[in-house]
């Protein structure tokens, strides 16, 4: 049979002369397959072209007679795996590569009706929180503004909002490639608040995908007063700011301007839904 070598710290280990590894046998795998998170410690490291020529640990592959590279992750992980396979082929050491599309964002190009690994579990756990928030809104007569992870896609926010019958869901895809502005987002939520009031309902909840932030122009970000730092891949580090608090503050300001007395509260659906125990769908996925 095959020997399975687990590599800690993601791609960092392949560009390190002394990678941290663990041999994974069947009894070990049987004890971790139904757990949340990752047994192998992860890393956000994405190698530059110069890293391949200067730091790539080809000896690790040849010494261990590695024939198959299995990667688990999103688009950055997949593209790097492809670069590694091509690099090794150029070095006369071709390998096979299998990529497991794992991301709660559900933003990889898979066959229709096939979500990414982990998405359904994150959606399920997010919906548990969102349902409780909606009950609180009805009980207290308040509004809640939720922000959900999703980087550049709105699938998670939409899935959670749809499951909980939220009166307003804001995702980047709904703007149909027109310019996304803070004013548009705020006005969508305000319109839902007004509509509910006309219906005799003084409470509600809106969920906004963090993906809308990626679509905001630099000018819009400056006008809003939002300050982002960026990771090594050039992505805004959205996890370092509370999107729910930002939007809630803007919505409260607009409500005050138009004379509507509505209390709203922010709720961030973030890292706490990433490493939840997988539901049955994901347990049978892979």
Task: List each model region and its residues.
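Glycine-rich oxoanion-binding loops at beta->alpha junctions
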Residues: 15-67, 76-77, 104, 114-124, ...
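Charged helix-capping and loop-helix junction motifs
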Residues: 55, 185-190, 279-284
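C-terminal active-site/capping subdomain that shapes the small-molecule cofactor and substrate pocket
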Residues: 258-286
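N-terminal phosphate-binding or glycine-rich loops at protein starts, especially the Walker A/P-loop
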Residues: 1-18
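Short gly/pro/ser/thr-enriched loop/turn and capping motifs at secondary-structure boundaries
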Residues: 11-14, 77-78, 103-108, 176-179
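Accessory alpha-helical/coil subdomains and C-terminal extensions
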Residues: 4, 60, 71-73, 79-94, ...
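Glycine-rich, charge-decorated loop segments at or immediately adjacent to ligand/cofactor-binding or catalytic sites
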Residues: 105-113, 275-277
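A short acidic, often aromatic-flanked loop/helix-cap motif at beta-alpha or helix-coil junctions
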Residues: 46-49, 176-180, 272-275
């Amino acid at each position: 049979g095959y020997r399975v070598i687990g590599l800690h710290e993601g791609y960092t280990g392949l560009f390190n002369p002394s990678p941290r590894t663990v041999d994974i046998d069947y009894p070990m795998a049987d004890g971790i397959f139904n757990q949340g998170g990752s047994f192998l410690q992860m890393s956000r490291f994405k190698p530059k072209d110069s890293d391949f020529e200067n730091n790539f640990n080809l000896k690790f592959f040849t010494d261990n007679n590695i024939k198959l590279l299995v990667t688990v992750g999103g688009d950055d992980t997949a593209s790097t795996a492809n670069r590694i396979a091509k690099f090794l082929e150029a070095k006369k050491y071709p390998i096979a590569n299998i990529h497991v599309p794992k991301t709660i964002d559900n933003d990889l190009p898979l066959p229709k009706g096939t979500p990414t690994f982990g998405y359904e579990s994150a959606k399920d756990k997010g919906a548990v929180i969102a349902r409780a928030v909606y009950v609180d809104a009805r009980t207290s007569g308040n509004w809640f503004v939720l922000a959900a992870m999703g980087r550049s896609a709105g699938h998670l926010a939409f899935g959670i909002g749809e499951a909980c019958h939220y009166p307003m869901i804001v995702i980047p895809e709904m703007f149909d490639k027109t310019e996304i502005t803070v004013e548009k987002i705020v006005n969508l939520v305000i319109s839902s608040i007004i509509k509910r009031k006309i219906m005799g309902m003084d409470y509600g909840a809106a969920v906004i995908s963090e993906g809308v932030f990626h679509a905001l122009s630099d000018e819009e970000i400056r006008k809003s007063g939002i300050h982002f730092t960026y990771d090594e891949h050039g992505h805004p580090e959205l996890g370092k700011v509370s999107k729910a608090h930002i939007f809630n503050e803007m919505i409260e300001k607009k409500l005050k301007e138009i004379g509507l007395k509505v209390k709203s509260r922010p709720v961030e659906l973030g890292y706490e839904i990433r490493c939840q125990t997988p539901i049955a769908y994901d347990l049978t996925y892979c």
